[in-house]
Amino acid sequence: MVSIEGRFTEASSLKIGIVAARFNDLITSKLLSGCIDCLTRHGIDTSESSSQLDIAWVPGSFELPLVSQTMAKSGRYQVLITLGAVIRGDTPHFEVVINESSKGIASVSRETGVPIIFGVLTTDTMQQALERAGVKNNLGWNYALQAIEMGSLMKALK
């Protein structure tokens, strides 16, 4: 039996794309900082002149699937990370946005074979979102770790 796993020690060879939503950028900018911190600590060049990391900004989480699809189809990335924050309001808009963005992102990943890490927070309150993107527990770090693992796993499977 062969056991195949992603390796965190092979991160420096990955080309990663991040698609981040501007809506609720108080949250998404913190998630992005967590991602960049993790990627840097794992040997990925995150400087302005980096050829290993590209960041695309979209208006909101609803637009994440389209830009993810374009990036995945470009053939330049081994893995993508999507970042967004959808906070429940008084209307059903929350359900529409999160349902369509999650289905769209999953569909793009399956269609293209490029792993896409789903880093879209879905919370009832801004406070809950801040707690998930804060200093003590920034899920952006976790999303970057998942990206490293999946990117290296997919390379190992090919």
From Swiss-Prot:
One of its GO terms (cellular component) is riboflavin synthase complex. Keywords: Riboflavin biosynthesis, Transferase. The active site is at residue 93. Its EC number is 2.5.1.78. GO terms for molecular function: 6,7-dimethyl-8-ribityllumazine synthase activity. The keyword Oxidoreductase does not apply. Pathway: Cofactor biosynthesis; riboflavin biosynthesis; riboflavin from 2-hydroxy-3-oxobutyl phosphate and 5-amino-6-(D-ribitylamino)uracil: step 1/2. One of its GO terms (biological process) is riboflavin biosynthetic process. Signal peptide: none annotated. CDD domains: Lumazine_synthase-I (cd09209). 5-amino-6-(D-ribitylamino)uracil binds at residues 23, 61-63, 85-87, 118. It catalyses: (2S)-2-hydroxy-3-oxobutyl phosphate + 5-amino-6-(D-ribitylamino)uracil = 6,7-dimethyl-8-(1-D-ribityl)lumazine + phosphate + 2 H2O + H(+). (2S)-2-hydroxy-3-oxobutyl phosphate binds at residues 90-91, 132. Belongs to the DMRL synthase family. Catalyzes the formation of 6,7-dimethyl-8-ribityllumazine by condensation of 5-amino-6-(D-ribitylamino)uracil with 3,4-dihydroxy-2-butanone 4-phosphate. This is the penultimate step in the biosynthesis of riboflavin. PANTHER family: 6,7-DIMETHYL-8-RIBITYLLUMAZINE SYNTHASE, 6,7-DIMETHYL-8-RIBITYLLUMAZINE SYNTHASE DMRL SYNTHASE LUMAZINE SYNTHASE. This is 6,7-dimethyl-8-ribityllumazine synthase. The lineage of its organism: Bacteria, Bacillati, Cyanobacteriota, Cyanophyceae, Synechococcales.
